[in-house]
Swiss-Prot record:
Reaction(s) catalysed (UniProt annotation): 3'-dephospho-CoA + GTP = GDP + CoA + H(+)
InterPro entries assigned: GTP-dep_dephospho-CoA_kin (IPR007164)
Pathway: Cofactor biosynthesis; coenzyme A biosynthesis
Species for this entry: Halorubrum lacusprofundi (strain ATCC 49239 / DSM 5036 / JCM 8891 / ACAM 34)
EC number(s) stated in the UniProt entry for this protein: 2.7.1.237
Protein name per UniProt: GTP-dependent dephospho-CoA kinase
Family in the record: Belongs to the GTP-dependent DPCK family.
Length: 192
């Protein structure tokens, strides 16, 4: 559906929010955002196996987690893989090629965000670009957390400003952006 053009790869390497290695600090910042945005039930969306594992280890099961069994294109270590496999959250399985966003992934993300219980989206392929549609689809006050290779975890507070930045990157991807918004259950201006 959408693919990352070679010309944009560098733009996608820049973190969209602050980077930390401390899950407790990240969770405190997420709670602060929920308070500031008057959104006490705003979800936390984790993109990546290692990020999901660290949040769970810190005592916070992500409301939505997207995992692919890999970190930096290598299989995650056994401890992380076993811990995530043992999680009893509802699971959705999707296919999503590298450097892409498939309709299947976008539809699953929309479905998972509407579920009151935690959902793990198991991705065959890669989930690396999933932070963008997560920012676009999540409610105000949510936090989207993803891994920054070699640095730590990035937390993006979902606000009108972060949605604008995500929208610009999302719409710069190659493919049918209108159909991608439809699969995500959103319209380009961010309304549901």
């Amino acid at each position: 559906m959408l693919t990352l053009p070679e010309s944009l790869r560098d733009a996608f390497k820049e973190p969209l929010g602050p980077v930390t290695i401390d899950a407790d600090e990240l969770l405190a910042a997420a709670a602060e955002t929920r308070g500031e945005r008057a959104a006490p039930d705003a979800p936390i969306i984790a993109v990546g196996d290692v990020v999901t594992y660290h949040l769970r280890e810190a005592g916070r099961v992500p409301d939505v987690a997207l995992i692919d069994g890999k970190t930096e294109r290598e299989t995650v270590d056994a401890e992380i893989g076993s811990a995530l496999a043992a999680a009893d959250d509802r699971r959705l399985s999707v296919e999503n090629p590298a450097a892409s966003l498939s309709a299947e992934l976008l539809e699953a993300l929309s479905e998972a965000l509407s579920d009151a219980d935690p959902v793990i989206i198991e991705v065959t392929g890669e989930e690396d670009l999933a932070a963008l549609p997560a920012i676009l689809a999540a409610p105000d006050g949510a936090s989207v957390v993803y891994g920054q290779p070699g640095e730590g975890m990035v937390r993006v507070a979902v606000t009108p400003e972060s949605r604008t930045e995500a929208r610009e990157l999302f719409e710069a991807l190659d493919g049918d952006v209108e159909a991608a918004y439809k699969a995500l259950g959103r319209v380009p201006d961010g309304d549901r």
